């Protein structure tokens, strides 16, 4: 039994909070905190009476370290689950350090004025967290998150050495809009409009956005076009997987999405450079986010499935081997359970699991760690229990 402070009240946070309330044996009490307290109150009202978990709410500016410290000291949680924006990772980390509270997030830090995410800012906290005697668990979503757990599990149970990892993220869902993003539009568009990259033979290979395209036949979804992107777990897996030669990340996109994205880029709407408009400074991408559908509203209208997983190639007992670990998630089943589409569900469930494992001591050690640095077995068991069952194949089609 423990207490968790959950910062954020968007689509992913809503799922994680639902799952914490389903898991009241672990989460005795939670506090939902966001800049907009009314959203937290509405979620509390929806969940109270359905759970034994006690729910509090609070208003907090996640950019303000002093406010965060005051809230942590008032609520006194065992863990802080950061489901706010990636720009706010470091202020929340600083508050956890000041209060000696364990920290979990789902995405790595990204400066608001630079569309570039990497782990160096968070890894810089290693000694500070170690000295404070607290744990920071980085990237406890699906990708990053479950993909790292899958990698650790494959290395522990299936391989002596993993040489190649292809991470495949397929969303076969249809929300009916000409253009919408399945998670925070600002973060999503920054990610897909950046240069791609992959890790090969000890160094980064950079590509133009959407330059490398492949087709893959996904179980439960069918044949889809997918594109190579830069993704954060590549950076940590390159360090933590001994013998690794190449890691790539592919994500599926439909032609309508890509056409709209290119058009928006061409007219400057994906820019993060501030402009003056009627005497006020605005960021075009943030304005675009305001006019696009809220990802949290897509649940009731999204149909289809996701398929996210990792294809591994390596050696076992001196012989070449391949292995595929993946999860299939149904958008409408997610909506029936927690009122969300599957993109938020596949991130929110692992966020709850990571917080649970840190809180109950299973994954506790002082310092800053990526998810693949812990024993994967408890997490893999919890995925099956809490709504993200995984599948295996020992003869998958490979990506060229």
Where are these regions (language model features)?
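Conserved N-terminal Rossmann-fold NAD(P)-binding element of oxidoreductases
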Residues: 4-11
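Short beta-strand element of Class I
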Residues: 29-31
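Helix N-cap at the beta1-alpha1 junction of Rossmann-like dinucleotide-binding domains, i.e.
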Residues: 36-39
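Rossmann-fold cofactor-recognition segment
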Residues: 49-64
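Conserved Rossmann-fold cofactor-binding substructure of NAD(P)-dependent oxidoreductases
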Residues: 61-77, 88
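N-terminal Rossmann-like NAD(P) cofactor-binding module of classical short-chain dehydrogenase/reductase
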Residues: 72, 78-82, 96, 103-104
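Rossmann-fold NAD(P)-binding glycine/threonine-rich loop
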Residues: 107-134
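C-terminal catalytic/substrate-binding lobe primarily of soluble NAD(P)-dependent oxidoreductases
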Residues: 156-400
């Amino acid at each position: 039994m423990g207490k968790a402070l959950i910062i954020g009240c968007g689509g992913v946070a809503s799922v994680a909070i639902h799952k914490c309330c389903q898991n009241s044996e672990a989460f005795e009490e939670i506090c939902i905190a966001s800049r907009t307290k009314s959203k937290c109150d509405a979620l509390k009202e929806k969940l109270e009476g359905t759970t034994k978990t006690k729910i509090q709410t609070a208003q907090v500016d996640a950019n303000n370290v002093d406010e965060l410290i005051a809230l942590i000291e008032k609520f006194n949680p065992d863990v802080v689950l950061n489901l706010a924006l990636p720009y706010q990772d470091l202020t929340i980390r600083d508050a956890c350090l000041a209060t000696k509270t364990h920290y979990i997030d789902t995405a790595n830090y990204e400066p608001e004025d630079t569309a570039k995410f990497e782990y160096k800012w968070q890894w810089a906290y290693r000694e500070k967290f170690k000295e404070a005697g607290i744990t920071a668990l980085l990237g406890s979503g699906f990708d990053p998150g479950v993909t790292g757990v899958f990698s650790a599990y494959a290395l522990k149970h299936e391989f002596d050495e993993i040489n190649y990892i292809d991470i495949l993220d397929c969303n076969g869902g249809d929300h009916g809009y000409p253009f919408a993003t399945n998670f925070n539009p600002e973060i999503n568009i920054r990610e897909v409009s950046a240069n791609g990259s992959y890790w090969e033979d000890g160094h980064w290979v950079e590509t133009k956005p959407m330059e490398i395209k492949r087709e893959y036949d996904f179980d439960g979804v069918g044949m889809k076009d997918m594109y190579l992107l830069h993704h954060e777990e590549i950076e940590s897996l390159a360090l933590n997987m001994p013998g690794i030669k190449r890691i790539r990340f592919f994500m599926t996109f439909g032609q309508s999405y890509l056409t709209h994205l290119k058009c928006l880029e061409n007219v400057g709407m994906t820019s993060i450079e501030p402009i003056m408009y009627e005497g006020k400074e605005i960021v075009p991408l943030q304005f675009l986010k305001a006019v696009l559908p809220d990802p949290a509203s897509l649940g009731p209208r999204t149909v289809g499935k996701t398929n996210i997983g990792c294809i591994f190639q390596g050696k076992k007992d001196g012989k070449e081997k391949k292995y595929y670990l993946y999860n299939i998630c149904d958008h409408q089943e997610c909506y029936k359970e927690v009122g969300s589409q599957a993109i938020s569900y596949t991130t929110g469930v692992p966020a709850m699991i990571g917080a649970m494992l840190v809180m109950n001591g299973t994954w506790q050690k002082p310092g800053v760690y990526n998810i693949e640095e812990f024993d994967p077995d408890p997490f893999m068991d919890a995925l099956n229990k809490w709504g993200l069952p995984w599948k295996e194949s020992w003869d998958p089609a490979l990506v060229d």
